[in-house]
Amino acid sequence: KNLINKGINLQTNSDTEVLLNYYILYGEDCVSHFDGMWSFAIYDIKNKKLFLSRDRFAEKPMYYYKCEDGFYFGSEVKFIKSLVKESLEINSEKVNKFLSFGARSLFKDNQSFYRNIFLLKNSENLICDINLNLKKKKYWNPNPKINSKINIHEAIEHSTLLLSNTIKLRMRSDVETAFLLSGGIDSGGIVSIAGNTMSKKINTYSI
């Protein structure tokens, strides 16, 4: 709606077209207008630079690798491996941490299981120019404000409203949506709120 109000005539229903037009309008600051999960790359022909971005909570992955012959990126390491000509060295330290501490260790830093293949961090943009110079920028930091003047009932009401609005926003889709139930309180609560606030059929799956 924001783009249409600015006189931009969208040709498709694709998120990609919306994203591209936001970049044309706002440049690198386009991500400050987004709410959700993303991982994308845009090559800016005019300014001769590659722009990579990852969402605020790192829900979508983005790996990158720089060497003498180029800059490589992808949502999975295997894509980079298939393109890089030189042999990649195993990152033994990262492997040992994973074997010792499990999946929690994967997100403690930007290292991958291969040396020099890095993971773009949450809320981070990366610029690669034609000389392969890299520049990273943190575009968002949480700023929790504690209001100790509200009582427990007001806090519950406010939190419920925030959660309901967030779920409603995430359920915007051109196709049917579905929920994966784990059997726990979190997923069950989300489905319950979705069912109460949306006039859509709720499809659920349990594995």
Describe each PLM feature range.
Residues K1-I207:
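Cysteine-centered catalytic environments shared across enzyme families
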